[in-house]
Amino acid sequence: MTYRVKLVFKAAVWVASLWPLGVLVRAWFTDDLTANPIDYITRKLGHTVLVLLLASLSMTPLRILFRWSWPIQLRRLLGLLAFFYACLHFAVWIGLDHFFGWGRMWKDVLKRPFITVGVLAFVLLIPLAATSTQGMIKRVGGANWRRLHALVYAAGGLGVLHFLWLAKKGRPGPYYFAIVLAVLLGLRLWDWGRKKLAPTRPSPKKRTRLPGVGEGGVVGAAFRPEQRKPRGEGRVK
């Protein structure tokens, strides 16, 4: 992928990802947030979190199935945008829904299961976003980083469960998210099993790599940064 094409893809991701936020801001200023504005904002932000998180998790399966390299360039960006919307979703719940009533929020977390799993999903996303840079991968260590980022599927599962419990009966939307997540996890497990069963080829020289998605197991790594080539590589001298 050339530098210009990469910029186009990333610009498209930014525009598509920030579009829901723009819709909410416009609705706020035009007083078009329905009869229950807080509920509308909360649901819109939560829906966007799941869309972006599943989009990020789908990048590696796309590479596995179609041998495309470009999805990997967008994986980390999509994951961080999902975390951004999760922060907004959580902030609205704290500030607008509960008006910083910490005691009432704590009671809701303990007594209402859909809130419990939603908070757990958000908490799991925090260390993933915090360790999404190349520098943090080196500091944490490859094996530890892979184990940590396996939590992305747990966060996705809890997020889908949060949506399933919250949604009204008869609405198929949450089930679509659950199916997509199950398919993505199944593809990663299939790829992991395929590599485990493949015969190992003796290599004349052992190579060391930075850990990445598709290298070393079923790790989702929605927040995995792209590997950059050093300057001058590939140039004809």
Task: Locate each region found by the language model.
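Membrane-embedded alpha-helical bundles that constitute the cytochrome b-like, heme-associated redox core
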Residues: 1-223, 228, 234-237
